Design a protein with these regions (language model features):
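Gly/Ser/Thr/Pro-rich low-complexity, intrinsically disordered segments
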Residues: 1-383
Length: 383
C-alpha cells in the first residue's frame, strides 16, 4: 500500500530538512508493541546516509556515541556480529559484523561464510553477502556484495578468500588492513564453513606485507593495530601452506574489492543484514512464530526514501514482532523493499531534536541500556 508524505503524517516531528521522526503502537500476534520510525528523503540534497562505525570494523560503541561522534541527526544499529566466543575458549570475540560494509565509498570488509554468521536463521535464498546500500546516485537498493581479490607472488596468483572478516573460508587466505583494528586475528581461523562452533584450525600462517614486500611471518595469527600501507595475510589449512612458500623481502601485491551482483552504480554506503521484503512482497519462508525486538530499514519511492524502523524494548512492549510481521509492517509503512538488521538487545534508534547538541535514544533498549555495536545506519543533514 502507499504511504502519505512523511511530514503529513500526524504526530511527525521534523528533525532536519528531509528527515522526520514519529512513534506509534502496533498490534501484533503476541501483543501490542511500540515502534519508532525515522523517514529520510534522499531527494533532498541536504541529506545523506552513511555507515556509523567506531573507526575499525572489529570494535563496538553505543549507537548514540557513534551518531554524536559522526554528527548524525539520526541513526539505528546495524548488522549482526561476532558477539561471543564461548565455543572457542581463550579466543577473543572480535565484535565484527557478519556482512560486508562500505563507508564513504570505501570498502571496509567482506562477508563471513554463511555457516559462520551470528544471528537468527537466514530466510531461504538469502546469504551473508546481502546488503542494503545507497549508491553514488543517492538511490537506496538491496544488493549483494562479493569479494574479488588476489595475492600476486613471484610464483603466481593466489585467490583471496577474505577481507577484514572474523571468519575465513576453510583452506583460504584473508587480508587484514588498518581498518580491521587491533583485535586478535585468531578467530578468523576458527570454525568451518558450515559450523561456526567448529574447532580452530591447527594449520595457520600469517605474513605481513609492507609497501609491497614481505617483512615478517608467524605460525599463528597475531594481534595489535595494523599500520597504514601494511597488509597482514592470514592463511588456514591449504591457504597457510601457500603462504609458507613466501620469503622475507619477496614482492607481493594484494588487491581486493567488493563486487555488486545487481547495481553498476558504486555504493557510497552499504551494510549487511538480510532482506525480508522485495518488490512489495514478503520473502517466502519468513519466520512467523518467534517474536522479538526488531530493527529494520525500508526502501520506498523508487529508492529515494529510507525508513529506519525500531521497536521498543520496554517491558510493556517487549513481545515485539516476528520477522514475517516486520515485513508486513514495513510494507504498510510504504516500503517496497525492506531489510532486517540486528535486533534484541542491539535494537537502538536515536534522533537529535532541532536545536539540540546531541542525539537521544528514542526506544528503550531491552537490556536496560544501549548495547555497544559495530556499525549502524547514520542520517546526516546540512540544513
Amino acid at each position: 500500500m502507499g504511504a502519505a508524505p512523511a511530514d503529513a503524517v500526524p504526530g511527525t516531528t521534523r528533525l532536519a530538512p528531509g528527515v522526520t521522526y514519529r512513534q506509534f503502537d502496533i498490534t501484533a500476534a503476541k501483543g501490542v508493541t511500540h515502534a519508532h520510525v525515522v523517514v529520510v528523503d534522499l531527494r533532498d540534497t541536504h541529506v545523506r546516509v552513511n555507515l556509523l562505525y567506531p573507526g575499525a570494523v572489529a570494535a563496538r560503541e553505543p549507537v548514540s556515541q557513534l551518531a554524536d561522534s559522526a554528527g548524525a541527526v539520526a541513526g539505528v544499529n546495524g548488522d549482526f556480529f561476532n558477539i561471543t566466543e564461548t565455543q572457542h575458549p581463550g579466543v577473543e570475540a572480535t565484535g565484527s559484523t557478519d556482512g560486508p560494509a562500505i563507508a564513504s565509498g570505501i570498502a571496509l570488509k567482506a562477508a563471513v561464510p554463511d555457516g559462520q554468521r551470528f544471528g537468527p536463521a537466514l530466510p531461504p535464498g538469502t546469504n551473508t553477502r546481502n546488503v542494503l546500500g545507497v549508491g553514488a546516485d543517492r538511490v537506496a537498493r538491496l544488493d549483494s556484495l562479493a569479494l574479488s581479490g588476489s595475492v600476486r607472488t613471484p610464483d603466481g596468483r593466489l585467490t583471496l578468500g577474505g577481507f577484514n572478516q572474523y571468519a575465513l573460508p576453510e583452506n583460504s587466505i584473508g587480508a587484514f588492513t588498518t581498518q580491521w583494528g587491533s583485535v586478535s586475528r585468531v578467530r578468523a581461523t576458527c570454525g568451518t564453513d558450515t559450523n561456526r562452533a567448529g574447532a580452530c584450525s591447527a594449520d595457520t600462517y600469517e605474513v605481513t606485507v609492507r609497501n609491497g614486500r614481505v617483512v615478517s611471518a608467524s605460525n599463528t595469527p597475531g594481534t595489535g593495530a595494523i599500520a597504514a600501507g601494511t597488509t597482514v595475510l592470514v592463511g588456514r589449512e591449504a591457504g597457510a601452506q601457500r603462504l609458507r612458500k613466501l620469503s622475507t623481502g619477496e614482492r607481493v601485491q594484494v588487491r581486493h574489492r567488493l563486487v555488486a551482483s545487481r547495481s553498476g552504480v558504486p555504493y557510497r554506503f552499504a551494510l549487511g543484514g538480510y532482506p525480508v521484503l522485495r518488490n512489495g512482497r514478503p520473502l517466502a519462508g519468513l519466520d512467523n512464530t518467534t517474536s522479538a525486538v526488531r530493527t529494520a530499514v525500508g526502501i520506498a519511492n523508487g529508492g529515494h526514501r529510507l525508513l529506519l524502523f525500531a521497536t521498543d524494548g520496554a517491558v510493556a512492549y517487549r513481545s515485539g514482532l516476528t520477522i514475517a510481521e516486520v515485513a508486513t509492517q514495513m510494507r504498510e509503512l510504504g516500503s517496497v523493499d525492506a531489510f532486517s538488521l540486528d535486533g534484541g538487545g542491539s535494537t537502538t534508534l536515536v534522533a537529535r531534536a532541532p536545536g539540540a547538541s546531541a542525539v537521544t535514544v528514542r526506544n528503550h533498549p531491552s537490556g536496560g541500556a544501549e548495547r555497544p555495536v559495530p556499525n549502524g545506519v547514520g542520517v546526516f543533514s546540512t540544513g
